[in-house]
């Protein structure tokens, strides 16, 4: 399938089965997302995998009542921790006084997703 066909056939799923997702598939999805372009190869995001039903239900409430039947939630968070360590190793200041790193981390997280 070429890129145009892929984009034209996109659809959004809002109702999920409760069928468990094999760990191998979860790992493959995370590995595939990690191959997306990102800022300076720093991958300014973290992925939290939630599989416990009570935690999924709690997250559902925080996400304006989105369904909680899915067997897992992947929460992708903008995270500049790697950049913080990179600056420390090089003895340079961390320029968090601007929005560039927030935007970079947000774009990285979005591309991963």
Where do the protein language model's features map onto the residues?
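Acidic, surface-exposed loops and disordered segments
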Residues: 1-113
């Amino acid at each position: 399938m070429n890129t145009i066909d892929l984009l034209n056939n996109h659809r959004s799923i809002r109702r999920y089965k409760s069928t468990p997702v094999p760990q191998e598939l979860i790992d493959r999805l995370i590995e595939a997302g990690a191959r997306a372009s990102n800022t300076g190869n720093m991958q300014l995001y973290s992925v939290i995998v939630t599989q416990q039903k009570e935690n999924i239900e709690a997250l559902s409430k925080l996400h304006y009542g989105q369904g909680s039947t899915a067997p897992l939630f992947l929460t992708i968070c903008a995270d500049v921790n790697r950049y913080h360590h990179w600056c420390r190793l090089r003895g340079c200041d961390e320029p968090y006084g601007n929005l560039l790193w927030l935007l970079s981390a947000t774009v990285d997280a979005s591309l991963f997703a």
